[in-house]
Amino acid sequence: MSKKKLVSILLSAVLCFGMLGSTFSASAAYVSVHLTKNQAVNSSSNVYGTFKYFWGTNSKSSKHSVYYIARYKHNGVWYTGGSTLLAAGREIDEAHAIKTERLDYETDWFLKLNPKGAGTKDCDAWGYMKNA
């Protein structure tokens, strides 16, 4: 095989894998948050986009219901783009995820888990948020 043909094949392979890799990384925006029994609130890291899907599980061992709150940033202020209250022992699976409101611009979002009641603790809950 000639050197020119080998270089051509290698460059084609690099280009194909590079495009494939960027496709997966662009659609893989996903965050999670775990609310432990000694926390009164916990939040995920940020994920960027116009809208999100979120879901989660509130453990049977939790003493309280937990609010799942999707928050987004606009002009430096955080707003609620969707929320639900999950009782202890309940879950929303990914197939039935809640869709946030859709914005006409991209911004940061995060998922906040907050037990019902001021300063309430003693819950074990997981939450997830992803790009559409």
Please identify what each model-predicted range represents.
Residues 1-27:
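Sec-dependent N-terminal signal peptides of Gram-positive bacterial secreted proteins and lipoproteins
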Residues 27-132:
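Post-signal peptide N-terminal regions of Sec-secreted extracellular proteins
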